[in-house]
A protein has these predicted regions:
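N-terminal loops that bind phosphate or other acidic moieties
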Residues: 2-380
Length: 380
């Protein structure tokens, strides 16, 4: 993988230390106050720049929208080459005790080791896309000793949501603040395009529970097979999600309550990551269903944060399309992916880079001596 630079790691660790030395909620409150709406003038200027390029109007479809979103997020239609990074949040979920996954928490630890070595699928894809990778322990049941892992553990694994809350409210806030710290640290180090991924056995169960509560949907319809389940195991997983919601009675109007009762430390940290990106005016690429669940939590805490998020792909998990609709964000890729770790965002990056090459270097209608296309309303 493209390992995080010492500068980036130092900045992240300083921000994490600052967060842990503050009272729970202080960092979150400060960041929420800094998030302004995305720059609509920059968005309009980006669309105007696209229209000036000698190609059919809107010819690159969703990629033109993505570049315009990036322009709005950074506050300028001059979208230069940007350093990019993928932060991957590791956490264990107590709900695995209910048999909702075919593997246990030892796999989280094994993947953490492999990621530090640059040996996971997402690491290979990030290297191809030119992105640094930052592994973060926010809630692993058993940590690993590796200098490349950011240690920001809030608690050694979450509780079993089938029988009680995943964590305390302060624990959820702390995890959100870890994500804020990571995003702000990367931005301080000069990273201008951010992405987040996750790894934690059982997190498609927790994300389905959080999503079901926030969008007030039938929980069973949002539960998928995760890393692979038999029909019987899928039925059990659906029952577990329903039981978790019934047992904890999370408040749909309070995202932190929902995260603390039926979520996970990884989802909470990713929520904070998107808030930190928005506060830093750095566009953030979404990933799959767990990422979108975290993004919805961020948007419910601060609607302005939505303007800094860029969709990449639709996961094969059932909740994915529902979450994207709720966010109002397009996902250009629909490849049936469900890998996690930020892999979908990394698959999208080279395609985005190719569109950006056209945006920056494409010849204009004026330069080619061609008449520019005009916009017409439908029916005219």
């Amino acid at each position: 993988m493209a390992e995080a630079t010492e500068t980036a790691l130092a900045c992240i660790r300083e921000e994490v230390e600052r967060a842990f030395s503050s009272a729970p909620g202080a960092v979150l409150e400060a960041v929420l106050s800094r998030i302004a709406p995305a720059d609509e003038c920059a968005r309009a200027a980006a669309y105007a720049a696209w229209d000036s390029i000698a190609h059919p109007l809107g010819g690159l479809g969703d990629f033109e929208d993505a570049v315009a979103r990036i322009a709005a997020a950074q506050g300028s239609a001059e979208v230069a080459e940007f350093p990019r990074a993928l932060a991957v949040f590791f956490s264990d979920n107590g709900v695995v005790a209910e048999g909702v996954s075919q593997s246990g928490q030892d796999v989280t630890r094994a993947v953490a080791r492999n990621m530090c070595e640059g040996a996971t699928s997402a690491c290979r894809m990030a290297a191809f896309a030119g992105a640094e990778v930052v592994p973060v322990d926010v809630g692993m049941a058993r940590g690993i000793e590796d200098a490349r892992m950011v240690r920001a553990n809030v608690r050694r694994g979450s509780g079993n949501i089938a029988h009680g809350p995943a964590m305390s409210r302060d624990g959820a806030v702390r995890a959100i603040e870890v994500g804020i710290a990571v995003a702000c640290g990367l931005a301080r180090a000069g990273v201008r395009l951010l992405a987040a991924g996750e790894m934690g056995i059982g997190n498609t169960t927790t994300s389905a529970a959080v999503a079901a509560v926030l969008i007030r949907a039938d929980a069973r319809s949002l539960v998928g097979r995760g890393a692979g389940l038999s029909d019987a195991s899928l039925a059990r997983k659906r029952d577990v999600v329903e039981r978790a919601i019934d047992a904890n009675s999370p408040d749909p109007a309070d995202p932190i309550d929902v995260l603390s009762k039926v979520g996970g430390f990884d989802i909470a940290a990713m929520c904070g990551f998107y808030l930190g990106a928005a506060a830093s005016k750095a566009p953030a690429l979404l990933d799959g269903v767990i990422s979108c669940t975290a993004a919805l939590c961020a948007a419910r805490l601060c609607p302005n944060a939505l303007g800094y998020l860029v969709g990449t792909h639709a996961s094969s998990e059932p909740a994915s399309q529902e979450l994207l609709r709720e966010l109002g964000i397009k996902a250009p890729l629909d490849a049936g992916m469900h890998l996690g770790e930020g892999a979908g965002a990394m698959a999208y990056l080279p395609l985005l880079d190719s569109a950006l090459r056209v945006y920056r270097d494409g010849k204009t209608f004026t330069a080619t001596g061609m008449a520019a296309y005009e916009h017409f309303e439908a029916g005219k």
